[in-house]
């Protein structure tokens, strides 16, 4: 899989831009604040209809314009497929093969991407919400039904929280409704938990040997999905019974707080090196090796799930890695994955992958191919 071309209309600082790409490595070279990251963000939006930088759709639309538009053509399974995403003040519209998609969950998954940016280094050491968002993005693009389930979960969670808030305020409401919402909540929660736990298990299978190699055989990586339920066995009904029992035990506490206290929206992923928690005890080098291993594992996992390698986006991350990790990253993707790199300079990066790259010079919203 690779992105053949992209057209941007009124997206960020690009009023009218058309580019054709190499199926191997493409480098966006330029000073800071010229629009390099905006180009990678456009590719990410074309793939996931979401950004790694903002959740406010208005940020994408050029000042005093009505809408932003991205068009791309991808080569996938021997076919050339046009994608289109329009962003207005009211929301998003998406098309595949010129056919409008009723839901974004039907659109996502046509173009698979893996992004590695400086903020992804906080995937290991940052707050649990960062890791939950990572799971949602990665599972969602491989299993679009997951996005539908996630949307349903968020809807029921919101309803349940509203009801708990009413009970907290001593309003006269039917107490049976809380039990009904809790049952619905548990069904969807276990669905998400199962998909997340399965993903983590597969991710570890790829990430562990990569980490072992980067650490020169000195470190063993383990990844654990820390769920609200006890993940004994493989029977979701057992998990659901455990969740319902726990929710019943904290029912009064939830009413007192007016909020749902357990569920996938509170779950986390934990990383261990040689048995020690990386978040708490890992050095900066170990945390970076873990993040790099996870990103490289994503590439292989997406290939396993979809039959195609994803597009890799490296947003100014090479400068955050030392020479050894740079070399391992570029060596792992060489000749295998279409890659987009943003950087202020390629000097000091001595690797054949970049020397053979197609370079685009970016300055004040203009892009020139070398």
UniProtKB/Swiss-Prot annotation:
Keyword Nucleotide-binding assigned: yes
GO cellular component terms, A-Z: cytoplasm
Keywords noted in UniProt: ATP-binding, Cytoplasm, DNA damage, DNA repair, DNA replication, DNA-binding, Nucleotide-binding, SOS response
Subcellular location(s) of the protein: Cytoplasm
Listed Pfam families: SMC_N
Listed GO MF terms: ATP binding; single-stranded DNA binding
First-listed, main subcellular location of the protein, grouped into a coarse class: cytoplasm
Record-listed ATP binding positions: 30-37
GO BP terms in the entry: DNA replication; DNA synthesis involved in DNA repair; double-strand break repair; SOS response
Family: Belongs to the RecF family.
Protein's job: The RecF protein is involved in DNA metabolism; it is required for DNA replication and normal SOS inducibility. RecF binds preferentially to single-stranded, linear DNA. It also seems to bind ATP.
Protein name listed in UniProt: DNA replication and repair protein RecF
Source organism (scientific name): Listeria monocytogenes serotype 4a (strain HCC23)
Gene coding for it: recF
């Amino acid at each position: 899989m690779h992105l053949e071309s992209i057209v941007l209309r009124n997206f960020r600082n690009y009023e009218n831009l058309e580019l054709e790409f190499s199926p191997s490595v493409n480098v966006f070279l330029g000073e800071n604040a010229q629009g390099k990251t905006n180009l990678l963000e456009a590719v990410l939006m074309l793939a996931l209809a979401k950004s790694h930088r903002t959740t406010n759709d208005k940020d994408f639309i050029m000042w005093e314009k009505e809408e932003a538009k991205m068009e791309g053509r991808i080569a996938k399974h021997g076919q050339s497929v046009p994608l289109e995403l329009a962003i207005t003040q009211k929301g998003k519209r998406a098309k595949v093969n010129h056919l409008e998609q009723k839901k974004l969950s039907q659109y996502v998954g046509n173009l698979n991407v893996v992004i590695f940016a400086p903020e992804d280094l906080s995937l290991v050491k940052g707050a649990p919400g960062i890791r939950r968002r990572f799971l949602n993005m990665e599972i969602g693009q491989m299993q679009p039904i997951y996005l539908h389930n996630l949307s349903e979960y968020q809807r029921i969670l919101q309803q349940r929280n509203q009801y708990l808030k009413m009970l907290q305020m001593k309003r006269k409401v039917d107490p049976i409704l809380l039990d009904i919402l809790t049952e619905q909540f548990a069904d969807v929660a276990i669905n998400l938990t199962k998909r997340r736990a399965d993903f983590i298990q597969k991710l570890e299978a790829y990430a562990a040997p990569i980490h072992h190699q980067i650490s020169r055989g000195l470190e063993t990586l383990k990844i654990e999905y820390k769920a609200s339920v006890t993940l004994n066995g493989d029977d979701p009904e057992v998990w659901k019974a455990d969740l319902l029992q726990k929710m019943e035990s904290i029912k009064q506490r939830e009413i007192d707080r007016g909020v749902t206290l357990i569920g996938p929206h509170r779950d986390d992923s934990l990383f261990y090196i040689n048995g020690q928690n990386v978040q708490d005890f890992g050095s900066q080098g170990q945390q970076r090796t873990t993040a790099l291993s996870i990103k490289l594992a994503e590439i292989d996992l997406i290939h396993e799930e979809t039959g195609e390698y994803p597009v890799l986006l490296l947003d100014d991350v090479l400068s955050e890695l030392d020479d050894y990790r740079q070399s391992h990253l570029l060596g792992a993707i060489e000749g295998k994955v279409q890659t987009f790199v943003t950087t202020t300079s390629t000097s000091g990066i001595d690797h054949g992958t970049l020397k053979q790259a197609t370079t685009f010079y970016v300055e004040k919203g203009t892009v020139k191919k070398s």
